[in-house]
């Protein structure tokens, strides 16, 4: 298997270690911004989209949905993840799974880093998706 090149959305923060292995140093990407979370596309190879979010406490993603199944991993801090049917406070180390086409929102309770994986990549769907 060959590591896919940077996708059409820009350069990748991955560093190639060999023809089939690449690494991304997530702590080096940690940056915040005022007015909303900092969103960095890590990779979109058509199979999955991987995005990292850096939130300041109180920042949020308002209710939205995507045509992909999502996995949300809280790497640092704590956030609240809400759907119409449930709400949970997710601390660092939590992994949340959500089916496609389910409206949800996110609020950072503390400064927080969240890794989002969408599968398959929204590039394979016709529905609009959240753009990083």
List where the protein language model places each region.
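A cytosolic small-molecule/anion-sensing beta-strand core signal
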Residues: 75-76, 91-92, 110
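Short acidic-glycine-tyrosine-enriched beta hairpin
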Residues: 84-100
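Ligand-binding loop in jelly-roll beta-barrel domains
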Residues: 100-124
């Amino acid at each position: 298997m060959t590591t896919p090149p940077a996708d059409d959305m820009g350069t990748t923060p991955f560093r190639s270690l060999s023809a089939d292995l690449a690494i991304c140093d997530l702590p080096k990407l940690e940056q915040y911004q005022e007015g909303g979370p900092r969103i960095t596309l890590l990779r979109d190879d058509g199979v999955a989209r991987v995005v990292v979010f850096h939130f300041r406490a109180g920042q949020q993603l308002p209710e939205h949905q995507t045509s992909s199944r999502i996995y949300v991993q809280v790497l640092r801090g704590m956030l609240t993840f809400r759907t119409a049917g449930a709400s949970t406070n997710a601390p660092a180390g939590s992994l949340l799974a959500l089916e496609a086409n389910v409206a949800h929102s996110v609020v950072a309770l503390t400064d927080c880093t969240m890794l989002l994986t969408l599968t398959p990549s929204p590039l394979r769907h016709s529905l609009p998706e959240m753009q990083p």
